Amino acid sequence: MHINFDEAQMFCKWKDKRLPSEEEWIYAAYTEMRKTSSSNFIYGQTYEYPVGDTPEGVNCLEDCKFKNNVNYKKLLSRGNGHSKVGVTKKGINGLYDMGANVWEWANIENKRTKATKGGSWWYGKEQMHLKHQARKDKKMSAVYIGFRCVKSLN
């Protein structure tokens, strides 16, 4: 995506939204908050990965058992590249692509570095684990970093 933190934040603001805080991102990605779920996720339970107890079904470098619907292998020296949005396994809270595909910017108080969450197709399953911490310079951009906007409810 090649979007740095400030660019992602400006886009969200333009859409009358914002980047999630790191805490909001973690909560949405790992803790099931739907009282009735069409998946087998249990209300109130926190999972190890954004798709449950294992990383199976997401677009990561290895160990995730996902077959990408787009073949970038000839263009890349590593990994499979991005997958189309929403084609990976549906995760916690019915959200897609919270694990792997692209790191997502999340806001923290530090002025120079910001959080990136969820891992990406460039990395293995460890980077999308609940306990993984990643910080990047807010001016950094890379093909494997993206974002999602959120809207405050109040």
Model-derived segments and spans:
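Functional-site microenvironments in short loops/helix caps that host divalent-cation chemistry
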Residues: 1-134, 138, 143
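Short, structured beta-strand segments at or near domain termini in extracellular proteins/domains
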Residues: 144-154
